[in-house]
Amino acid sequence: MPTLLIIRPSNRPQQDIQTCHAAGWQAQVLSPIEIEADRSALKKLPEQFKQADVVFWVSPTAIETAAPHLNFSDGPRAHITVGQTSQHTLAQFSPYPVFSPEDGNDSEAVLRMPIWKNLPPNARVLIIRGHGGRDFLADKLTELGFQIDIAEIYFRRPHAIDWQHFKTEDIAAAYITSGEIAREFFHQIPPQFSRFFESLLYFTHHPRIADALRIVGAKHVKTVTSLSAALSSIPQRSQAVNPVEDN
């Protein structure tokens, strides 16, 4: 049975592992970055939450870190997420409808959503994210006249991968979910595995991450809509381990 490497923080891969098993794949997790909650920011978050007219959640990690600290009955009823996975995650905490874009899974797609036209002028938008997140949406919403409040409630910390017992046998591809993770992962690769990881097939869900992978040295990168789509695009193991052309 082929193995897919899931390269992401260890708090996130459970659903990915289930997806792999359902598709007939083994899954192995490597975490070059881990998530650390910002306790000080979380203490301030409930008051920011109460004052907001709408909340934008940037990721499932932002939701899982922040939501347990909030009373949703005290906050706004308008909630926006960057994608379907975040939407489903937030639905476990919020009794209110959750909106996400239908034509993408990034800040650009969120900005195109019609909900912004239905909000009152000068509405206060709370963006809940990790430290060092993109400012694209905040900047664009400010230009549109919204008041922006940003809660950076977690850190992404480099985490040393244990390579002592790592084996390349049966590893057919990898799935990676951020450019920052791609850069840290390739930074940690030992010399004896460098050629293997340069030639491995990588899947990701966004062209920006695909570009980051190519910059750090990945030769074979494919952009897909989801992990399920990635797995279904390789019906046979031989297709995963042989060189392929980039999209």
PLM-predicted stretches and their roles:
Residues 1-247:
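Signature of uroporphyrinogen-III synthase
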